[in-house]
């Protein structure tokens, strides 16, 4: 394993901090883009920790180089969410250390925030929505995300729920 990874345990308190950062970045995005705020501000289905960091939350041994966080929205009939949106944020000082690839730019670990809209309605069960999306493998994002793990960080009552891998669903 690379020394660039942190092997510190991710707690629910850590997930809450990451969720707060994601929420703040989301509001900043909508503030800069009122056209997207009109369509999507009230259509958030869930937010998930993904890829290696999520797998580390599940198994405790993968390690973390970056926290990948995805926000998923119920697709609006007028336009899909601009999924190319990609924002980097700073976790700040923490037990996870600093971003090894660019330590001068970050006080702590890097958080990469992405978002996309999915074929569902506001209020749909986020677990079912994500499992259906990942099982379908219809997009490159779905195929990439299902290779590791997804752990919900919003809505808060699902904080820490492991959506993927799911023992109840076939993995491919």
Each language-model region and where it sits:
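N-terminal regions immediately upstream of nucleotidyltransferase
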Residues: 1-34, 38, 61, 81, ...
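Short, conserved charged micro-motifs
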Residues: 76-85
């Amino acid at each position: 394993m690379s020394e660039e990874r942190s092997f510190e345990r991710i707690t629910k308190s850590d997930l809450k901090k990451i969720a707060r950062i994601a929420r703040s970045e989301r509001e900043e995005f909508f503030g800069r883009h009122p056209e997207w705020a009109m369509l999507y501000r009230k259509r958030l289905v869930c937010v998930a920790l993904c890829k290696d960091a999520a797998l580390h939350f599940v198994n405790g041994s993968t390690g973390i180089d970056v926290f990948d966080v995805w926000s998923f929205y119920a697709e609006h009939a007028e336009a899909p969410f601009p999924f190319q949106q990609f924002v980097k944020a700073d976790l700040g000082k923490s037990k996870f250390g600093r971003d090894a690839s660019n330590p001068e730019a970050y006080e702590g670990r890097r958080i990469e925030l992405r978002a996309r809209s999915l074929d569902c309605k506001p209020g749909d069960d986020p677990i079912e929505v994500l499992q259906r999306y990942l099982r379908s493998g219809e997009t490159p994002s779905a195929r990439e995300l299902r290779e590791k793990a997804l752990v919900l960080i919003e809505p808060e009552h699902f904080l820490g729920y492991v959506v993927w891998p799911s023992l109840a669903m076939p993995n491919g």
